């Protein structure tokens, strides 16, 4: 298992076309936003 640490407003890139953005961290809750092409199933 790969564990990554990121702060709010940082992002993780998966390949060239998928971005995972850390929107907010509130205690143990993390809000993420995923930006990917339509043909990629999330």
Model-derived regions, located:
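Compact, glycine-rich, soluble single-domain proteins
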Residues: 1-42
């Amino acid at each position: 298992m790969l564990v990554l640490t990121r702060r709010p407003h940082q992002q993780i890139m998966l390949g060239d076309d998928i971005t995972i953005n850390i929107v907010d961290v509130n205690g143990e809750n993390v809000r993420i936003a995923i930006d990917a092409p339509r043909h990629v199933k999330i």
